[in-house]
Amino acid sequence: MKYDEIKITTRREINICEHAISKLEKIIASMERKYGKGSKDFFRELEGTPHPYDSDIVHWYESFSALTRWKERLAAHQEIMKL
């Protein structure tokens, strides 16, 4: 793979990451408005309590976890672009 092809592929990956992050941030923002708390505070309060089976909370937690992974992936691709 040539250097230009690597840059193009990496740029595409960055765009995919940014799109996924945008969607997840919208989901998380709507849940934070609904429950009136920030994600980190809300999940910190849930630690040590029985697992909530409310589908909204589960979806919120999964989205929050996925957001962390997408941000890590984005950072890795941005690091490649710097080379």
Where are these regions (language model features)?
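Generic secretory/membrane-interface signal
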Residues: 7, 19, 48-50
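A generic membrane alpha-helix/interface feature
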Residues: 43, 54, 74-77
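Amphipathic alpha-helical coiled-coil segments
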Residues: 10-24, 28-31, 60-63, 67-70, ...
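Short acidic DE-rich linear segments
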Residues: 78-83
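Short, glycine/alanine-rich amphipathic alpha-helical segment
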Residues: 46-65
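Hydrophobic alpha-helical segments, principally membrane-spanning helices and signal/leader peptides
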Residues: 3, 21-23, 41
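Short, charge-rich amphipathic alpha-helices with coiled-coil/heptad character
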Residues: 1-11, 45
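Short E/K-rich amphipathic alpha-helical oligomerization segments
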Residues: 29-51
